[in-house]
């Protein structure tokens, strides 16, 4: 098991720059092959690819981003994105919840941390940028957890809602499984508190 995890982590490192170049290409190419770098999911949360330094002003000034949830490992953002200290100088708080690229599944604990982080900024009327490398899997899983918490949706409903806005997300079976565990926790807690309402969407 440990050997498999090491192999997967090593493969993710080897493929990082080739797959990032592909993401950059899809962000620049016109027509049907084009993929927007990020999308606004609701008044609080934006889901996207790496927040490159060139996007900083747009995110902070235009999108009112005051929190960033980074699902990447440190090596993925070292040269291309603001450091935690640089974000802080801009008035932005960064929460890093490192998850291996391509095969990684966010932990249940990290989903809970990320959701509470987003809810904090929701209460302040400010926005949170949730990202991984391409904004398709790791970060989409986190945003799905946030929607489950906010709307009491099922994992499938949350994923469908995101896909309507950002059609090229890709939630893997293991990621859906952890969302089901998260939903189970939310449902149990809400039922105990008498606040659970079955979604009609």
From Swiss-Prot:
InterPro entries linked: Dual-sp_phosphatase_cat-dom, Prot-tyrosine_phosphatase-like, PTPMT1, PTPMT1-like, Tyr_Pase_AS, Tyr_Pase_dom, TYR_PHOSPHATASE_DUAL_dom
Membrane topology: Peripheral membrane protein
Complex and partners: Interacts with STYXL1; the interaction inhibits PTPMT1 catalytic activity.
Entry function: Lipid phosphatase which dephosphorylates phosphatidylglycerophosphate (PGP) to phosphatidylglycerol (PG). PGP is an essential intermediate in the biosynthetic pathway of cardiolipin, a mitochondrial-specific phospholipid regulating the membrane integrity and activities of the organelle. Has also been shown to display phosphatase activity toward phosphoprotein substrates, specifically mediates dephosphorylation of mitochondrial proteins, thereby playing an essential role in ATP production.
Name of encoding gene: PTPMT1
Domain of life assignment: Eukaryota
Record field: transmembrane: none
Protein's GO biological process: cardiolipin biosynthetic process; regulation of intrinsic apoptotic signaling pathway
Protein name: Phosphatidylglycerophosphatase and protein-tyrosine phosphatase 1
Lineage of origin: Eukaryota, Metazoa, Chordata, Craniata, Vertebrata
Subcellular location: Mitochondrion inner membrane
């Amino acid at each position: 098991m440990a050997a498999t995890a090491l192999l997967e982590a090593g493969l993710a490192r080897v493929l990082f720059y080739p797959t990032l170049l592909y993401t950059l290409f899809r962000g620049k190419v016109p027509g049907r092959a084009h993929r927007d770098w990020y999308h606004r999911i609701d008044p609080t949360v934006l889901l996207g690819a790496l927040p490159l330094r060139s996007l900083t002003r747009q995110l902070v000034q235009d999108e009112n981003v005051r929190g960033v949830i980074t699902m990447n490992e440190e090596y993925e953002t070292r040269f291309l994105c603001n450091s935690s200290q640089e974000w802080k100088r801009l008035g932005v708080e960064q929460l890093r919840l490192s998850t291996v690229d391509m095969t990684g599944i966010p932990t249940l604990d990290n989903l809970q941390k990320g959701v509470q982080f987003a809810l904090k900024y929701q209460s302040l009327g400010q926005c949170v940028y949730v990202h991984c490398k391409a904004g398709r899997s790791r970060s989409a899983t986190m945003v799905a957890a946030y929607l489950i918490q906010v709307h009491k949706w099922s994992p499938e409903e949350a994923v469908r809602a995101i896909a309507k806005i950002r059609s090229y997300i890709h939630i893997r079976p293991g990621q859906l499984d952890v969302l089901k565990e998260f939903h189970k926790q939310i449902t149990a807690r809400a039922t105990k508190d008498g606040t659970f309402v079955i979604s009609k969407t």
